[in-house]
């Protein structure tokens, strides 16, 4: 095919040339479902292209490095007709099966990556974006806005996990809640509610609630403190404690009148350790140059070095690491 013919084909199908020249853009386009509010569609599509590059690079590096992909794909036996109680119970059961402990939110991201083969990426997202679920035939990915409060991040991660586990039976829309008609809107609303109940059960199972003990004299401060222990928001924990009969319903009324300051929590490192490890190996093996890796991650070379340090990953020798890493 000649260059003019190629350009004609690209123009006809409205496909950018980079789709064929950039090795990190997957030929099998990832499916995304975004959890967002008030984002400009064009900006969101541009950000999605960046996310597709990160995902594509992670996959291609894995193939070139001979790293096995998970042959198992986890699913959740729920449908949009399932009850909220069933969704909550499924979340709680998964917390036990994955051995997330008494603070599931603190362990969820690591367990999703280590035991479920799901890539988690903490990203600097556009304003209004909380997170996204993305799936390919051989990889599931959860993207989370790392600049959200910890409780929101963990809830979004659990919510996106639900979508990844139910993608075949309840495929989410590109935008959460996007519907073509009233009937579809009702169904999608139900699915989102099921996702929220699953997330609540996963992050706040009965065992974790019981481990909190009895409320202190200042219920508002006690709930706020225990929410920090679990890695959830005080409001979300308040609902669960009321359902469990541990605190009175008046708590929600009182807390809405008396706004509590958000707890300051540390910003999680960019991307994730598995992503950083694979990127470092790719640089060491000559699969990508340091400068190209900086462009891929949208970081300066110095910031990329700090990325490896933040995740406890040894820097490649070309970035000041030991020479032995290239062996």
Where are these regions (language model features)?
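Short juxta-domain linker segments that transition from a proline/glycine-rich
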Residues: 1-327
